[in-house]
Amino acid sequence: SFIVTSGGELLKFVDKKKVKIFKLPVQSKNPLLIFINSIILIGIILLNNISIVHARSRAPAWSCLLASKITGRKFVTTFHGTYNFKTNLKKFYNSVMTRSDLIIAGSNFIFSHIKENYSEYLNDKKKLLVIFRGINVDYFDASTTIESDEKKLLKNWEIEKDKKIILLPGRLTSWKGQEVFIEAINLINIELGYEAFYAVILGSDQGRELYKKKLLRLSEQYRMSKQIRFIDNCKNMALAYKVSDLIVSASNEPEAFGRVAVEAQSMRKPIIASNIGGSNETVIDKKTGF
């Protein structure tokens, strides 16, 4: 197998003996770079006799589309987001994910979203099917964490080990619902008091410094600065779930699949998720979550 990527944390999990990695600026939306990437991809495809090209993101998908057309290779895309569009230009940009020979939808919700919004790009020759996103259940296994690591993590988070923890994982962006989460914590405090538990907002701001400052101001406004922990990242998410007592997915826009809910369930932790999008397929109310 071959991977073309601009880099990232997940590269450390790739078996370098079985997979060859090429690094290109495929994350760029610059039309010139997209074209240059496609030319380089053509060379990679031909030199390595690659028969199937698979894209999971829009910018590299445009490069892959051009490269696969020129080389005559099969093209597969995984449509794993709603890719909001307010203009026809944005919709056209998104449509590359439906221009492949095979379109994989990450959930029934995404399957319906494609049919409803991109029908003009679909035809009888294209196949559209649902393949649910998977998780590594061996990694997200509550029995595999080490107690000493759990204590170390709590110490790093500056949380007392006998206190309950409510965890909201996800990058800091408005649609992930961090503001709603803080508002909800404030309401719980009114009922239970500030000393009852800690709340952890776990995720990088990815450059959204103004949004993070807004969240910090909101927590200060409700006098929760000492109760809420803002953690940029955690290299061992299984451990983060293990030390937490309740997991929350507060997204105010539909999740394509709802990975947080499934990871929490795999770790045998209760999950509260928004009643929209893919979460409706991964959380059965009052049975596998709320």
Regions found by a protein language model. Name each.
Residues 55-61, 79:
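Short His-centered aromatic/hydrophobic patch
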Residues 207-212, 224-234, 240:
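Active-site donor-binding acidic/aromatic loop of nucleotide-activated sugar
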Residues 3, 270-273, 283:
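Short hydrophobic beta-strand element within catalytic cores of glycosyltransferases
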Residues 1-32, 115, 121-127, 207:
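N-terminal strand-loop element at the rim of the active site
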Residues 100-130, 135-140:
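A short, active-site helix/loop in glycosyltransferases that binds the activated sugar's phosphate group
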Residues 164-190, 213:
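A conserved mid-protein helix/loop that constitutes part of the nucleotide-sugar donor-binding site
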Residues 119, 141-159, 215-216:
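A short helix/loop element that forms part of the nucleotide-sugar donor recognition site in Leloir-type
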Residues 2-9, 135, 169, 198-213:
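Glycosyltransferase donor-sugar binding loop
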